[in-house]
Amino acid sequence: AILRGFAPSFYQGEIQGEVLVYGKPIGEYGGELATKIGYVFQNPFTQISGVKETVFEEVAYGLENFGVPVEEIVERVEAIMKLTHIDSLAEKNPLELSGGQMQRVALASVLVLEPDILIIDEPTSQLDPQGTESVFEIIKMMKDKKKTIILVEHKIDLIAEYADEVLVLKGGKLIASGDKAQILSDMALMEQGVQLPQMAILGS
């Protein structure tokens, strides 16, 4: 649903409501919207191109497609790989990495494009606690850089720690929205099957 909403000309079917980017409905944008929004898939394996032999080349792939000069590509890729702590993996094959490493490569491949908006779909669903921590360190860095981040996540502890605004969906419908403190202290949501943080339950 998130992807369909941001690509209305690609996915067919009935779509209700609207999404505005810079005050303009996304349906009125052309291909230039692709330069403003970065999408990180739930499964990093589906994001890896499969045509590049090294992590460095994989991270550079999007910039090559946008026609960025080689010197700038090298500079931006080196910087983002250092930021995401994958510089030591530069010469490794992306398809031979661990799940956590591959997810960081997928993130770096999007971040190097410098999008204004990041859509991240359950980035830790297949990761162990260490991999989860490393990925959310990167998300926090992007948040500190004032990037707009739309995070699809089911783990309530991560939502409690990193979110500012929370939207709760059930059966494809929005059932609650508001600031984090308001949503995570709403006991009525438990009747909808939403698991609230233990501290919120104890304090009720």
Region spans (language model):
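Conserved ABC ATPase signature
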Residues: 93-97, 101
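Conserved ABC ATPase "signature" region
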Residues: 71-89
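ABC ATPase NBD Q-loop/coupling interface
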Residues: 18-32
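Catalytic Walker B motif of ABC-type/P-loop ATPase nucleotide-binding domains
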Residues: 118-121
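Conserved beta-strand-loop-alpha-helix hinge in the C-terminal portion
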Residues: 173-196
